[in-house]
From Swiss-Prot:
Compositionally biased intervals (Low complexity): 41-51
Name by which UniProt lists this protein: Neurexin-3-beta
Alphabetized UniProt keyword annotations: Angiogenesis, Calcium, Cell adhesion, Cell membrane, Cell projection, Glycoprotein, Heparan sulfate, Membrane, Metal-binding, Proteoglycan, Repeat, Signal, Synapse, Transmembrane, Transmembrane helix
SMART domains noted in UniProt: 4.1m, LamG
Laminin G-like domain location: 83-283
CDD domains (alphabetical): LamG
The protein's role, per its UniProt record: Neuronal cell surface protein that may be involved in cell recognition and cell adhesion. May mediate intracellular signaling. Functions as part of a trans-synaptic complex by binding to cerebellins and postsynaptic GRID1. This interaction helps regulate the activity of NMDA and AMPA receptors at hippocampal synapses without affecting synapse formation. NRXN3B-CBLN2-GRID1 complex transduce presynaptic signals into postsynaptic AMPAR response.
Any GO molecular function: calcium channel regulator activity
Binding sites annotated in the UniProt record for Ca(2+): D135, I152, I234, N236
PANTHER family per the UniProt record, alphabetical: NEUREXIN-3, PIKACHURIN-LIKE PROTEIN
Compartments, as annotated in UniProt: Presynaptic cell membrane
Amino acid sequence: MHLRIHPRRSPPRRPAWTLGIWSLFWGCIVSSVWSSSNVASSSSSSPGSHSQQEHHFHGSKHHSVPISIYRSPVSLRGGHAGATYIFGKSGGLILYTWPANDRPSTRSDRLAVGFSTTVKDGILVRIDSAPGLGDFLQLHIEQGKIGVVFNIGTVDISIKEERTPVNDGKYHVVRFTRNGGNATLQVDNWPVNEHYPTGNTDNERLQMVKQKIPFKYNRPVEEWLQEKGRQLTIFNTQAQIAIGGKDKGRLFQGQLSGLYYDGLKVLNMAAENNPNIKINGSVRLVGEVPSVSGTTQTTSMPPEMSTTVMETTTTMATTTTRKNRSTASIQPTSDDLVSSAECSSDDEDFVECEPSTGRSDKSLSTSIFEGGYKAHAPKWESKDFRPNKVSETSRTTTTSLSPELIRFTASSSSGMVPKLPAGKMNNRDLKPQPDIVLLPLPTAYELDSTKLKSPLITSPMFRNVPTANPTEPGIRRVPGASEVIRESSSTTGMVVGIVAAAALCILILLYAMYKYRNRDEGSYQVDETRNYISNSAQSNGTLMKEKQASSKSGHKKQKNKDKEYYV
């Protein structure tokens, strides 16, 4: 058998275009990843750059804005924001009651809250145990200084910040921790106040009188002492949390933000209409706008909150305008912070707002508490945005009404019930203005080409928990939804670009694989005809040789016949 092997061609070198395709493929992937990371870093670094500039600009100015909004990052969105409530001059109360079968007993407690006030005496928060036990924990202001008093068994334990008064109208954050009888209290970034109880002398007294106690009473006495020791470390059967001090006659007047107690965000729960929370008196959630007279009341404020025009209970209103933002149910100019500064009346007086004249529509509105709680408005470098001075008669600065609000007011007389979204009081485009920072807390006014955003504040909680994020009346939005809407336009282009680049790379890769599989390769082939001829020749070897010899001789003879001779 003869095997004829065609020469196998060695595999050709990988052509240069294949290397080019691979390099293009990896280049697309690297560029896509780099562009996405670059966009993410730029979007995350922009707020930081604003805050750095604001600290630099405002290094020599110490102004505080009582009402602030913390716009949380992505990782903190979705239910983590706090709420801010304003307590008026007539006093108010937010009361949270634990269910009867879910009353906790704690060995350690953590309380934190942000506040701003000018009163010298008042109760901010008080936690009481079930009736008959007598355990309590109370955060209060006494003679302008913040302090905590608690009783978990026998005597009242007090801890107080003695250095500096806190009724200066500025925003402060107070943190209190308790572990047994030990306690700490800190205001802002000031030094921590600590309290450690003295040693228990019951055992020493027991040793002294033990000889006089009958033997059969020794065991009950020891058990009684052990029970007393347990009561000195455990806050038993907590029943309710009272905010505002109205139930005790020590009214708090000012604002409270982001209250946190042992995992409960009570102000958040109040803003969400928790069934275990009741609100009484002059209490208003920041972001709610009082209804115009003639319309139905859209807020949960009781009628006894009504006061006179001069007894305004609002703080500085940061009215902002957001353009080019719209959702299915939110107006483009929503997501603003308004504290009843659109009218010269109190936030509890639902009287009709009359439009004013002049240039007051270009300024921020401020109002103060009569007899105490005063809003500190920021100083503006630009004259166009300098707030109007507070008038001596009404002590309230008002803004002019937009045409939309005038139409709302006119429609109210005809029976219509409009809903006034927060921030509808000023719809003019605002020019960029200098950044503002609240000290000692890092705050900021975010700037844009056509809008002014509210400042940032740090959380009064222990681990950077955000505070006030007001919502619009009638619309309950998840905190952080505005940022998601604002970022969607920038991320959509990035996602489309990444998908297109990936699809192009995949097509190029498939084409390269197709060309590589269909290339020409060397092959082996067996010549069967030669195989049969050789088999027939092997049967008679001599015949084959004779045929070869005869063929050679015949060929020679033929050659000889063809020869020609010339003479």
